[in-house]
Every structure is written in C-alpha cells, then in structure tokens.
Swiss-Prot record:
Pfam families xref list: OsmC
Any single GO BP term: response to oxidative stress
Protein name: Organic hydroperoxide resistance protein-like 1
InterPro entries: KH_dom-like_a/b, OHR, OsmC/Ohr_fam, OsmC/Ohrsf
Family: Belongs to the OsmC/Ohr family.
Length: 140
C-alpha cells in the first residue's frame, strides 16, 4: 500500500503540556478543557479541527463528482468528551453539521453527506469506535 502523506506530532506533558508538528505548523500549549485559559488548545479541539477539515474536503469532492456547482460546503464538527458507562475512562462522540448550497433536495444532500462519511479517512478511522451523528442543511 502506497503512503500518500505522513506527518508527525510530538507531545511533552500530556494534557497539560505542549505539542508541535515536525514542521512547526502546529506549535501550541495543551490544557484539559476544564482548565482552558484561552491561550492553550486541547486534544478535542485539535481532533475537531482535523476531522472537520478532512470531512469537508470529502464532502466537496462528492458534491463535485455529482456535478453540484457552487455548493460552498461548510462543516461544523462538535466533539464531546463524555462519560462512558462501560469504562472508567471517558469517550468521544461527534456531531457533523453541514451546510450546502445548490443541491436539488434534502434527500440528495443527505445522500452526498453519507457518501462523504463513507469516503472520509477520519470517518473510516473512527467507524465503530465513536458515535457520529450526521446532519445536513440545504441553504440559499
């Protein structure tokens, strides 16, 4: 299998530490969400940013493959860190909310969103591991 891309991130100090990528494009302090100070990020925000970007890229590709012009897709991804009744450690859940223009019907928009979910590498990586709720809104 050919590798299309590889990146590295290094953390020191865990959830109360610092993380950077090998190219320093990301170079930030990390704090748990409960200790947010407005300057540091947290793993959940980093996951949400990556997943939202990846998913919107997949959604845009699916829309273009289906000849939807000027769709201007927008994806907002909500990540929750929540209690897991089956384990001592918490778990993640995700809501993916998309907005799209110039789609003929809500039914088409939902199909394209599901196709994006099937295609997105983040969705593939999390499938069966976390709860993911999909929602799409057709806007003018």
């Amino acid at each position: 299998m050919a590798v299309q891309y590889e990146t590295k991130a290094t953390n020191v100090g865990g959830r109360k530490g610092h993380v950077h990528t090998d190219d320093n494009a990301i170079n930030v302090d990390v704090l748990p969400p409960q200790q947010a100070d407005g300057k540091a990020t947290n793993p959940e925000q980093l996951f949400a940013a990556g997943y939202a970007s990846c998913f919107n890229g997949a959604f845009d590709l699916i829309l273009k493959q289906n000849k939807v012009r000027d769709a201007e897709p927008e994806v907002t991804l909500t990540v929750r860190l929540e209690d897991d009744p089956d384990a001592e450690s918490p778990k993640l859940s995700v809501d993916i909310h998309a907005k799209v223009k110039n789609v003929l019907s809500q039914e088409d928009a939902e199909k394209y969103l599901q196709d994006a979910h099937d295609f997105c590498p983040y969705s593939k990586a999390t499938r069966g591991n976390i709860d993911v709720n999909l929602n799409v809104e057709v806007v003018e």
